[in-house]
C-alpha cells in the first residue's frame, strides 16, 4: 500500500483517494490504472474526468483511445444534465466532446453508437432532433409519463366546497396572500384530479 500511495500521489491523487482506489481494485490497482486510467472517473467517487485525463496523458495513453472518448462523452452529458436537463442533443454532445478531447467527430460518433448498442446510452429523436439520454433519466421520464397517463383516465371524487372562499379564509388567517397563478394551481388541484406544477429556481 505505501508504494501504491507514492505512485498515485505522483499524479496529484490525495491520500483518501488512494485508499478508495486500493479498496476498489486491491493490490493490482497500479496495473489496472496503467491499462485504463479512465476507470478512475467511472468507478471512484471524487475523481473526475480531468484527473483521469491528466493521468492518461502522463502515462502515454493514446488520446484517441475508446476509453478516453467514452469517458469524455459521459463527462459532457453528465455536466449538461447536472444543469437540470434530462437529455442532450446528439450534435451538441459531439461538438462539446470534440472541444474537450480534440479528437475527430467520427470517433465520437462511433463511440456514441457503440454505447447505444451496449445500452449504456439511449439515442432517440425528439422533434426530428437526435438526442442522447443517460438510461436512468430516460426510464425515469418514461415512468413519470406512464403514471400521469394512468392518473389522467381515473375517476376522482368531486369535492363540494367553495374553494375560492376557503382560499380567502386561509389568507386572512395566515396573513399569506397568494398570487393569481398560485390560486389557479390550488383550485386546479381540487377540480382537475391531477395537476402538474412546474417552476424554475426561486419560484417557490
Which residue stretches match the model-derived regions?
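Conserved ATP-binding/catalytic motifs of P-loop helicase motor domains
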Residues: 1-204
